[in-house]
Amino acid sequence: MNKIVICILSFFLLIFSSSFFIVKEGERGIILQFGKVLRNNKQKTLVYTPGLHFKIPFFENVKILDSRIHTMDNQADRFVTKEKKDLIVDSYIKWRISDFSRYYLATGGGDFFQAEVLLKRKFSDRLRSEIGRLNVKEIVTDSRGRLTTDVLYSLNKGTINLDSTSLINVNSMNALGIEVVDVRIKQINLPLEVSDAIYNRMRAERESVARSQRSQGQEKAEKLRATADYRVSLILAEAQKKALMIKGQGEAEVAKLFLENFGQESSFYFFIRSLHAYENSFKNSNNIMLINSDNEFFKYMNTEIKN
């Protein structure tokens, strides 16, 4: 008897516990009845907000979905501009579930990773299409805001009309039950091979400028050296000229004095000349002269000094 009561109580307790479910903050719940999403009389999906809710046990199952905004990084990829130039674009998008029923059905039971795979594919296609309409200058400078705005609008609405050009796309985000909240471009770079080529060209240009400046510097240095050498030559020539003039004036003055003194004291003049001759003759101790002592050269040596 006790076992039967316990079994009955356990059964009702199981039914009672299966009749309620809790939806947490940042989540939403939908009811599946025999594998189909439960709708109201207006054929709108019943979405359960955070709180405690009732369901029919065994016949209805609850699927909890994340209602928060998600950030999805789009791996840096190569894109071609209007000018047929390649760019490496690194971007990300923010998204959230806008239609929980459609999201559940489109992603195979609310598979988050499947949703991001589909979203990345659509986002990459749309971004590629938009970049293909712009040139590099527009993308890098004033049109980055317009670019992301156009991508955001086209992802959510499916079509955009700019400059009378219609870019048609299937309502893929609506089909997934997803709303793209924001689109951002983190970084725009040139491909590595292009960057290397630009760097090499810039380096070659800088080296050419450096060589030109060094050549100009060497040319100026040569001109300065030549000018300095010329001025030195002029200064030396002028100095030598003045020295010769001074020397000539001195010799003339000496000759004048000698002539004047020679006329007055000729013996003293010859005496001085003999002393100079003695000095020059015996300057080198290795010199040997064989001269008769009665020679005129020794005239003043043989003369006795008288007080």
From Swiss-Prot:
HflC and HflK could regulate a protease. PANTHER family: MODULATOR OF FTSH PROTEASE HFLC. One of its GO terms (cellular component) is membrane. It is found in: Membrane. It comes from the Bacteria. This is Protein HflC. The chain crosses the membrane at residues 3-23. It comes from Buchnera aphidicola subsp. Schizaphis graminum (strain Sg). Belongs to the band 7/mec-2 family. HflC subfamily. The gene is hflC. It holds the Pfam family Band_7. HflC and HflK may interact to form a multimeric complex. Keywords: Membrane, Transmembrane, Transmembrane helix. It is a single-pass membrane protein. Its main location: membrane.
